[in-house]
Amino acid sequence: MRRELLLEKIDELKELMPWYVLEYYQSKLTVPYSFTTLYEYLKEYRRFFEWLIDSGVSNANKLADIPLETLEHLSKKDMESFILYLRERTLLNTKNKRQGVSQTTINRTLSALSSLYKYLTEEVENADGEPYFYRNVMKKVSTKKKKETLAARAENIKQKLFLGNETMEFLEYVDCEYEHKLSKRALSSFRKNKERDLAIIALLLASGVRLSEAVNLDLKDVNLNMMIIEVTRKGGKHDSVNVAGFAKPYLENYITIRRGRYKAKKTDLAFFLSEYRGVPNRMDASSIEKMVAKYSQDFKIRVTPHKLRHTLATRLYDATKSQVLVSHQLGHASTQVTDLYTHIVNDEQKNALDKL
């Protein structure tokens, strides 16, 4: 979603919210939470507040009128009723006829509510320097996490990684073969964005940055002489990220055509641009996701930008056998997250031995 559209949707949701949610939103901007995260949280709050009114827990006529006391006195039984509602509600905007949302969605909803309750009961200060209230019902609500061993997760992910020679084969496929299957109209669009698309894919495969980090990259953040990019990690931490050398020609080719092809001016700071009717804009996450899905599905299997991040991490661990190095490359504070890649690499080694 384009940043401008995202901010518009956030403003629409803010108009519906009670004053204490608006305070929460303003507070989290200073952390900073990303606008994408805050947008998703606001959507969860809207769903929760709508349920409070529809279920009769609150007598308010509109969401903005739900008093703080409703949240303060909400019982564990009330919250469990809300969770049950999520499990049983009919899914909207989908061909899937099953009832209820997934456990992952429920966990995301509860995470958003936990963040709001923590703010109201611990972080905010009233005129006396105290939080608005102390009772946090979310601490009494347990979440059910998806049970899956690292080995099982590694097996599921492994099939969606472009390991070994497949990393360069994927880039070469997009560069040299993909266009032969296209109609004249599709070919024109492909050729306009070919250098940019290749640069994005190469950067993701060569650095392992998150999609949001690639989207928010500015021209000034890219140093091709040192093959380093400056990114803002989760939690607002700034980081310098090394980029593998194989991405350099793709990035150089894109920079060569960026200004002329996308009508970029000095005021257009974004590194990856799209252009519509002569107006350049920062390329949004949704467009990159669709682009990666399109090329990868035609090459081998449909994947997400996050799978390209997993690809880099797995290849780096395979080459170095260092979880510390991989965690630093990915911007993780702990090596625990990188345990997954040891399982993937070990499976690859076992497969190689079986062929001897």
Curated annotation (Swiss-Prot):
Purpose: Site-specific tyrosine recombinase, which acts by catalyzing the cutting and rejoining of the recombining DNA molecules. Essential to convert dimers of the bacterial chromosome into monomers to permit their segregation at cell division.
GO terms of biological process kind: cell division; chromosome segregation; DNA recombination
Domain Core-binding (CB), residue spans: 16-121
PANTHER family for this protein: PHAGE INTEGRASE-RELATED (PTHR30349), TYROSINE RECOMBINASE XERC (PTHR30349:SF77)
One GO term describing the cellular component: cytoplasm
Boundaries of every Tyr recombinase domain copy: 169-354
Enzyme active site: R210, K234, H306, R309, H332, Y341 (o-(3'-phospho-dna)-tyrosine intermediate)
CDD domains, sorted: DNA_BRE_C
Gene Ontology MF: a single term: DNA binding
HAMAP family per record: Recomb_XerS
Documented activity regulation: FtsK is required for recombination.
UniProt keyword list: Cell cycle, Cell division, Chromosome partition, Cytoplasm, DNA integration, DNA recombination, DNA-binding
UniProt similarity note: Belongs to the 'phage' integrase family. XerS subfamily.
Keyword Cell cycle in annotation: yes
Compartment list: Cytoplasm
Protein name as annotated: Tyrosine recombinase XerS
Disulfide bonds: none
UniProt-listed InterPro entries: CB, DNA_brk_join_enz, Integrase-like_cat_sf, Integrase_catalytic, Integrase_recombinase_N, Integrase_SAM-like_N, Recomb_XerS, Tyrosine_recombinase_XerCD
Entry-linked PROSITE patterns: CB (PS51900), TYR_RECOMBINASE (PS51898)
Primary localization class, coarse: cytoplasm
